[in-house]
């Protein structure tokens, strides 16, 4: 499991699901790290920092830390992030919007939904394979308990 902590110093950590093997991945250059998202395809951990106005990533073991997006790209207060396919999506509470861009290259930033949200925070993409289709819904509705 992975988590972020806004303490002094702010950090991003990981541990086994039973709490053992705790390890600090990042504890420098962070202030309000949040919105952790794992890209299983590339084995990367992404996060937003709402104070530094950046979206960064590293490998899931903490190596190879890189900045993907900054205030120079229009980020004002990124908070929640999620990964879907080749895209990263994030909420920005200062802009009251949801944005997307390519998860490896800071280009083609698009507004997905904008200007009518009030303090958007968390966001989660749901893989199409995990969504309920009509056949799955029919199966569930026919179950007897």
Regions found by a protein language model. Give the residues of each.
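Residue position within the beta-strands of beta-propeller blades
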Residues: 2-4, 46-47, 90
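Beta-rich, blade/repeat-based domains predominating
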Residues: 28-44, 73-87, 117-135
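Conserved N-terminal segment of EGF-like repeats
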Residues: 135-145
């Amino acid at each position: 499991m992975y988590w972020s902590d806004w303490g002094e110093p702010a950090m991003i950590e990981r541990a086994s699901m039973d709490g053992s093997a705790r390890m600090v991945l990042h504890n420098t250059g962070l202030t309000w790290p949040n919105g952790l998202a794992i890209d299983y395809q590339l084995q990367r951990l992404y996060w937003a920092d709402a104070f530094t106005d950046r979206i960064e990533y590293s490998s899931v073991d903490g190596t190879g830390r890189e900045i993907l997006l900054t205030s120079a790209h229009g980020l004002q207060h990124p908070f929640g992030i999620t990964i879907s396919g080749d895209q990263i999506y994030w909420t920005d509470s200062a802009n009251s919007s949801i944005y997307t861009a390519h998860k490896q290259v800071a280009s083609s930033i698009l507004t997905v939904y904008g200007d009518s949200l009030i303090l958007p925070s968390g966001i989660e993409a749901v893989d199409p394979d995990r969504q309920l289709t009509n056949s799955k819904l029919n199966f569930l509705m026919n179950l007897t308990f």
